[in-house]
């Protein structure tokens, strides 16, 4: 089963497919930006025959000035996946952090450090945190599907219990 992890962002959307990561960066604004990011995600999903996607959920505690625009992006991407019959699961940011580090309040630097220590992968560049988050989301999905190649602690696996997994194939 081909899987994808998505850390949605208006400036640098992190994408993980089979453990390989990249980011989507566009120079446009407004609705045109939403369309470009959506199209890039869907084209990549179709090209790689993606069968299920893990998306990071909204951060309700965030005070970002662009939270409404990020919400629009989340809705646009979810609708596009639905229209292409690609099932997805939404993973809360605190569950992603807890899975990566054992602590639900861990920030991006802690997540990157913890994942690097476990895997040897170095998350460099300005988009490293976004790519790392997408990788973690995909790993959570792979664990749930019984396909992860890594050993995870009980504390990390407990993060899976806070995710609504219904609707996924073979779960």
Predicted ranges, named:
Residues 1-171:
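Phosphate- and other anionic-substrate recognition elements at nucleic-acid/protein interfaces
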